[in-house]
Amino acid sequence: MASKKIKVDEVPKLSVKEKEIEEKSSSSSSSSSSSSSSSSSSSSSSSSSGESSSSSSSSSSSSSSDSSDSSDSESSSSSSSSSSSSSSSSDSESSSESDSSSSGSSSSSSSSSDESSSESESEDETKKRARESDNEDAKETKKAKTEPESSSSSESSSSGSSSSSESESGSESDSDSSSSSSSSSDSESDSESDSQSSSSSSSSDSSSDSDSSSSDSSSDSDSSSSSSSSSSDSDSDSDSSSDSDSSGSSDSSSSSDSSSDESTSSDSSDSDSDSDSGSSSELETKEATADESKAEETPASSNESTPSASSSSSANKLNIPAGTDEIKEGQRKHFSRVDRSKINFEAWELTDNTYKGAAGTWGEKANEKLGRVRGKDFTKNKNKMKRGSYRGGSITLESGSYKFQD
């Protein structure tokens, strides 16, 4: 904890390139936890937004961003990234961008590291807020479906953590897929360094870790997943100067669809923005129907194949009884764990359990030939010859022709 706060104090002293590198690294650590669940990251981000607002309020452009309508964009709609409590000033082509980006970079690096530090503390609180936010989100989705999107309909699919929001108003914010919260949007603004630093400030200061892609068109459609978790965050009072209500309503300055985006994205783990949520649900339904149709086809085909197999096998099956052990006089009953009367063989090959030698029956064939040539008791007579007890005739090919003479 202490080490991270020291890093926050050191950030403003770094050069511009080092700031960008450290912003990405710090924001990626916070975004990894945010992608897991927007509800879990919500409480931590709300607490961090209070910290980030205090740091950015001293910055030069904090006055414009505190009103949370500060996102100066070409399109007339107010951006949903207005939830970024302090210098969110989403990248626009206006001239005020350079000031807000320089001030935002200092606040973003501090607040993003604060978010990662505060997330460990607020894990216990997240479970309670997740339930409340789910209830609120369900209500907000119904409202959002009736409300049209703002004038600049930015087509953006904020999938998972990375929200690559491409707006139609001539500005593309390509957010980094690795760091969702620091979506460094490269826009048509004056300088890329300004856009990255300002986008990072908007992402870190927004009261949500998840995707606050500061789209240049400032349309509400996608920072949607960012405003999504911010509304669920707003249960805990954010000290930021933005208009986000602590009562749980979405960012007041953000236009109509931000509240609806919150419900969908937070429920689906930051995956789909409002514009994509309908299509994604349709895809899910199509997949479900396809799976069901496959499931219906497979049992039908299997049922067709199994009767044919069973019929063919039943035709070939033979019920050959194993028989019973015949006990001769003077014999004891052989111990057996198997009751032969209950056993049936399905083929005649199974009834033969005679052992064929490992040498491919060559030993058995040789033994048969020797038995034919030298007699039935060849081995026994051979051993007698070794002992000298054999009394036979001259050795010929006829059986029993061996004889040793003293």
UniProtKB/Swiss-Prot annotation:
One GO CC term, this protein: nucleolus
Region (Disordered): 1-335
Post-translation changes: Pyrophosphorylated by 5-diphosphoinositol pentakisphosphate (5-IP7). Serine pyrophosphorylation is achieved by Mg(2+)-dependent, but enzyme independent transfer of a beta-phosphate from a inositol pyrophosphate to a pre-phosphorylated serine residue.
Keywords: Phosphoprotein
Modified residues (Phosphothreonine): T289
Biological process annotations from GO: nucleocytoplasmic transport
Biased composition (Low complexity): 26-115, 149-168, 176-186, 194-233, 243-268, 298-316
Record PTM Phosphoserine, positions in chain: S133, S293, S394
Compositional bias annotation for Basic and acidic residues: 1-25, 125-148, 283-297, 325-335
Source organism, top-level taxon: Eukaryota
Main function: Not known; weak suppressor of a mutant of the subunit AC40 of DNA dependent RNA polymerase I and III.
Name listed for the protein in its UniProt record: Suppressor protein SRP40
Organism from which the protein derives: Saccharomyces cerevisiae (strain ATCC 204508 / S288c) (Baker's yeast)
Gene name linked to the record: SRP40
